[in-house]
Amino acid sequence: MALRKKNSLLNMANSYVLDSPQPSNLNYFWNFGSLLALCLVIQLATGITLAMHYTSHASLAFDSVEHIMRDVNFGWFIRYAHANTASFFFICIYAHMGRNIYYGSYKTPRVLPWSIGVIIFLLLIITAFMGYVLVFGQMSLWGATVICNLVSAIPWLGEDIVHFLWGGFSVGNPTLQRFFALHYLMPFVLAVFALLHLIALHTAGSSNPLGITSNVDKLSMHPYYSFKDLITVFAFLLMFTLFVFFSPDKLGHPDNYIPANPMVTPASIVPEWYLLPFYAILRAIPDKLGGVIAMVAAILILLILPIVDRSIIRGNAFKPISKLLFGFFICNFLLLGVLGQVHIEPPFIVLGQICTIFYFSYFLILLPMVSTIENIFFYIGSLRK
């Protein structure tokens, strides 16, 4: 018997990584899970190294980042690797979630892995926001001011919660201290949830492009899918290094290279690009509390997908109407991202409201309606046989 099967710990790892049975028809859209694991490892390694040289003090934070860039051996590489991996993390998780929505991987028996995945996504957004503040440039300061101020929309307790988050009456040294402590902790929390996600997925088994049960035709994870994952890992590293070495600031904001100054407001206050769709939803609602509720609901509404999708067939492989609807949803989400970075002026205000209505309508109206219509078509088709 092989050593990996004799030892109890190695046997458990072997059942998840090497000998794990997988459907035989998985395509490259199933490779984003391994890329997300790679992103998490890179973030942990670079983040711990950066924390050794970073100073979480309002007067020293910006200078400590510049010290890392100029004086620490390969500090520029570590800092840019950490910043760009955050962007690639979101690229991969958006692609991963989009694949799950398209192929119906949230349906029974994979409701638990999907729910844990949505929680991971929410934690990732919070972690990225706190990390962005730590640079303490202009956009960091005003981003923290604006985003934390949204909590004040909560009736009765809002103002007190904002002061608790800031550690005072404005963004300052206590804010950096607590954000740094939480930002250091959150990746380990994410790692725990990623492990829970993997356990839940191992219990239910992976879905496949056809949306059918694949118990009769499976392959071991190694060597078939491990080598398949390596192809996208190398492609990922190629794109990643191109950004780190040649365009490290392409996905960032130039205002964050200006030290934080509470007396000077930037021309426009926008979050990082990966949060722009939800920022557009926030701005589409004139009422402050309504905007906050809509922004949070835009994330949490993903949890109801297993309920609102009434289709008797998993995935969109054989559903042309659902394919078209999903295409509109993706285009709408990308348009929300564009609207999140433009100034609030006509016609962008109305366009943002239309896109927000379509976003929520997709989950609450269009998906249940289209899935019901397609069920009727499938039923009629089965009667003709």
UniProtKB/Swiss-Prot annotation:
Question: What is the UniProt remark on how the cofactor binds and its stoichiometry?
Answer: Binds 2 heme b groups non-covalently.
Q: Which domain of life is it from?
A: Eukaryota
Question: According to its UniProt record, which cofactors does this protein need?
Answer: heme b
**Topology with regard to the membrane?**
Multi-pass membrane protein
GO cellular component annotations, sorted alphabetically? membrane; mitochondrial inner membrane; respiratory chain complex III
Report the locations given in the UniProt record.
Answer: Mitochondrion inner membrane
Q: Where does a ubiquinone bind?
A: 202
| Keywords for this protein | Electron transport, Heme, Iron, Membrane, Metal-binding, Mitochondrion, Mitochondrion inner membrane, Respiratory chain, Transmembrane, Transmembrane helix, Transport, Ubiquinone
Other facts: Heme 1 (or BL or b562) is low-potential and absorbs at about 562 nm, and heme 2 (or BH or b566) is high-potential and absorbs at about 566 nm.
Q: What name does UniProt use for this protein?
A: Cytochrome b
Q: Which species does the entry assign this protein to?
A: Yarrowia lipolytica (strain CLIB 122 / E 150)
Q: What gene is this protein translated from?
A: COB
